[in-house]
């Protein structure tokens, strides 16, 4: 059962054109189908079926139906699409009347498919693009992209070769210029330091001469600068001891003063507290005094009233 099914899958039947008595022939084993050819064949079969339905409807109505001027046909299938089916499958439909050259040419579908795509565009300008045009477009774009990439790579190689040769020369020139500038600055600094050293040596010589003259004058007057220096050293030692003793005594006195000041501050704070208490007591006493005065005045008024009543 598997062999007839395989044969049925491999055979292809005619969908358009007048019926013939010849039986359908299977594909030769040497024929090969590319992916875009299988997709184009499927789309062409769909268009052929639509064209057959359209032709049957037109035959029953007695002629071709004229579509409205602003309406596009729902099924983009015409006799041109049926013709493309015959061109796309020449080895499976010998009744179309095509020669053997077209069958051998069907293996390389690229130019034929491009012509068919142009015809379909001309017939159906508003419809979607078929798969064949998409495949051809993608291949053309890929070829253009590859050609552009190769050209850009060649241009880059040609431009990089002289640039790489010139780069180290320019870098060396820049480095040499920098080194020359640094050398000039160093030479200037050396000359300046040499001049400063000469000035300093001259000043040192003058100071030594002045020192010798001063010592000679002191010796001529009978003064020994060495003894004077010892005496001057001993005098500050005595002064230093005296000042240290004074400082110690002052520190002791300051400590005593601080202690007494703390005690006095504590006493002052205690006195302030006592004063506050006494002020509060005086305020209370005054309040009590006023109350007593008020009560006394009330009592005097009551006594006067009682005397008046007694007199009555």
From Swiss-Prot:
The keyword Metal-binding does not apply. Keywords: Cell cycle, Cell division, Centromere, Chromosome, Coiled coil, Cytoplasm, Cytoskeleton, Kinetochore, Microtubule, Mitosis, Nucleus. Its main location: nucleus. GO terms for biological process: cell division; cell migration; cellular response to epidermal growth factor stimulus; chromosome segregation; mitotic sister chromatid segregation; regulation of attachment of spindle microtubules to kinetochore; spindle organization. The keyword Membrane does not apply. Residues 166-210, 246-287 form a coiled coil. One of its GO terms (cellular component) is nucleus. GO terms for molecular function: microtubule plus-end binding; protein homodimerization activity. Residues 1-171 are annotated as: Disordered. Residues 156-312 are annotated as: Interaction with SPAG5. It is found in: Nucleus; Chromosome, Centromere, Kinetochore; Cytoplasm, Cytoskeleton, Spindle pole; Cytoplasm, Cytoskeleton, Microtubule organizing center. Residues 131-143 have a biased composition (Basic and acidic residues). Essential component of the mitotic spindle required for faithful chromosome segregation and progression into anaphase. Promotes the metaphase-to-anaphase transition and is required for chromosome alignment, normal timing of sister chromatid segregation, and maintenance of spindle pole architecture. The astrin (SPAG5)-kinastrin (SKAP) complex promotes stable microtubule-kinetochore attachments. The coiled coil regions mediate binding to kinetochores. Part of an astrin (SPAG5)-kinastrin (SKAP) complex containing KNSTRN, SPAG5, PLK1, DYNLL1 and SGO2A. Interacts with SPAG5. Directly binds to microtubules, although at relatively low affinity. Interacts with CENPE; this interaction greatly favors microtubule-binding. Interacts with DSN1/MIS13; leading to localization to kinetochores. Interacts with MAPRE1/EB1; leading to localization to the microtubule plus ends. Interacts with PRPF19. Interacts with DYNLL1. Interacts with MAP4. This is Small kinetochore-associated protein. It comes from Mus musculus. The gene is Knstrn.
